[in-house]
Amino acid sequence: KIESRADFNDWKTQTNSNDVEPLNALELPKGFFNTEQALSKVGSTCTIVGKVVSAKFSAKSEATFLNLDQSFPKQIFSVMIWKDGRKNFSYKPEVDLFGKYITVKGRVELDKNGVPGITVEREEQIQFLEEE
């Protein structure tokens, strides 16, 4: 029977075990926004808070990509650190920020897929949540 040869795992929705729910917006300090609220902040400079659940350094472009709260392909907020910005870091963001709750300050823009994100150019734009 064809059913016995089917792999039903292919039909399941893929989730990443690192994914988390966004922080409760009502519990954040004034002026801080969670990853779900980021979409309403497009075009504004603000501070977004979330957990780095996926992180990748691209050797080809020398860029770093961080997803907060939800991993690719279901990401709801991304942080991009391009080659020129990465030079301003004293650490490897994809290593040292992975699994941590962080704040990211900058202008929220949409990527080509409509996902909000911030391009970071300086280390000071990212802080560990506990440091705030």
PLM regions and their residue ranges:
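OB-fold single-stranded nucleic acid-binding module
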Residues: E3-E132
